[in-house]
Amino acid sequence: MSSSHTVDLNSSQLASARRLIWPTAAVIFLFTVSYPANDFAPPPSPPDIGLGMLLVYAAIAAVTGGVVFAWVLPWALRQESSGGVALALAVLGTLLAPAFWAGFPPALAAGGALLGWAGIHARKGRSLSRAAFGIGVLGVHFNVASYAAVFI
């Protein structure tokens, strides 16, 4: 006797994406804040920015991360198709990667990539989700490369 059951890949992917929202948000926040923190506290020289400016950068990163990961992604994951939203986030995060220091491109790119990944097996908007995933991953890489270029 054999038993077979089907696995809904879309439901599994959505559940995984929901579990990854907060860890992704935390990593993106720490990455975004690490740049001004590095300017604030280099040991051998006086800081380039003051505590107030560091807190402004942290606030921008927190608000952007909050909007993307606490509001947009949970809302979009409840929709039948979230490919368009994912693509918009991914494209913005990728195009704005050279301005990663502004505090919001990393969250946009990562949010677009995560949302795109969540919709790869969706019944509707699958192509947009796949494009968003690819562009979002590229955007995250561009943000990291832009960050690294500052220190090389």
In which residue ranges do the predicted regions lie?
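Juxtamembrane boundary at the C-terminal end of a transmembrane helix
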Residues: H141-I152
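Membrane-helix boundary connector in multi-pass membrane proteins
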Residues: A97-A131
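Polar low-complexity intrinsically disordered regions enriched in Ser/Thr and small residues
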Residues: L55, G119-A122, F142
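A broadly tuned preference for mixed-charge, low-complexity surface segments
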Residues: R78-S82, G125-S127, Y147
